[in-house]
Amino acid sequence: MDLSPREKDKLLIFTAGLVAERRLARGVKLNYPEAMAYISAALLEGARDGQTVAELMHFGTTLLSREQVMEGVPEMIPEIQIEATFPDGTKLVTVHQPIA
């Protein structure tokens, strides 16, 4: 399989997001990289499913709560920016204060 660097990045985000999802399902609090991967993977999948940038900006704030992450993680993530592929091209999605 010959993947471009961008495709490799997306695959890495998805894989890390899947690990974070499994840990969350077991009740494990997520650390910084896991929280970033979990939210980023969900945003990429949402774009692939046809959600708009505005919908994803809101959706990104509903994925994790303070109770689901380790202490200090919400303050470490004031925003998340990710380039997602939409039906009409690639766009930057920015989610402010993703962990409420």
From Swiss-Prot:
One of its GO terms (molecular function) is nickel cation binding. PANTHER family: UREASE (PTHR33569:SF1). GO terms for biological process: urea catabolic process. It is an enzyme of class 3 (hydrolase). This is Urease subunit gamma. Heterotrimer of UreA (gamma), UreB (beta) and UreC (alpha) subunits. Three heterotrimers associate to form the active enzyme. Its EC number is 3.5.1.5. Signal peptide: none annotated. It holds the Pfam family Urease_gamma. Belongs to the urease gamma subunit family. Keywords: Cytoplasm, Hydrolase. It is found in: Cytoplasm. GO terms for cellular component: cytoplasm. InterPro entries: Urease_gamma, Urease_gamma/gamma-beta_su, Urease_gamma_sf, Urease_subunit. The keyword DNA damage does not apply. Pathway: Nitrogen metabolism; urea degradation; CO(2) and NH(3) from urea (urease route): step 1/1. It catalyses: urea + 2 H2O + H(+) = hydrogencarbonate + 2 NH4(+).
